[in-house]
Amino acid sequence: MRAEPGLSKRASLERLKTAGLELATVFDVGVAKGTPELYGIFEGVRYVLVEPLEESRRFMEAIVADHPGSLAIHAAAGREAGEASFVVSPNLSGSSFILNPKHGRRRTVPMVTLDGVAAEHDLSGPYLVKLDVQGYELAALAGAEQVLGQTAALIAEVSLWGDRKGVGMTQFLPLVAWLQERGLVLYDIAAIIRRDLDDAITEMDLVFVPASSPLRANVSYKGPEQFAASTARRRGGFGLD
C-alpha cells in the first residue's frame, strides 16, 4: 500500500494549530513504534501513549523520556477495563483484537478505558485523540465518552472497504455517524492510503472536530482580498476587465 503524496498528520495538525487549536493532553492510542508527526507541534501538552504490544514498550518509554510529564500505558483501549485476548500479527503493526487467530498468535493483554485513564491520572482537556487500532476504533471510543466531551480534535484511521474480512472491523459510515451523534464532525483528511493491486483507496486518516468548534465559526470560503482576486480571474476568463 502507498500513501497519497501531499497529505500527512503533521500537515493537518499544523493547520489546526495555525487556525488556533489549543490542547492540554494528546492521547496516542495505538502507538506501535511511535507517531512522530504527532509530537512536538503543540507546546506544553502531556502525551498519553496507550498500546498493548509489549514489543512497543521501549519505544514508548523513549518517547516519554523526551516529553517529561507524559505517560506510557501498556494496555489496550476498549469499552471497559479488564483483560482481553489480542492477536499478535507476524509484522506486529497489524496486531488487533479482531484479527483472525490463524494470522497470528493470541496474547492476553490488559485493557483500559480512556475515561478511566483520564480520571486515574487527573488528565484535563482540551484533548486530541489519535486512534490507530486496526479496526477496533468504535470499541475504544465507547470507553471514552467523557474524554470525547472535552476533545478538540480526533484523528482516526478507517477503512473504506467495509469489513472486508468479516471480523467486525469499524467501517467508514458507522464511525462518522457515531461521532456525529456525539457532536464531532469531519474536518480534514490527514492521509489517504491506496492498495497496491489497483491504486484504489483502502483507508484514510480522518480528522474530526466538535461541530461547535471555533475552527468552524467562519463559514466563508474566502477573505475579501481572495474573493476580489478570484472574481478578477473569473471575469478575465470571459474576456472582461
What are these regions (language model features)?
Residues M1-D241:
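Phosphate/nucleotide-binding beta-alpha loop and adjacent structural elements of enzyme active sites
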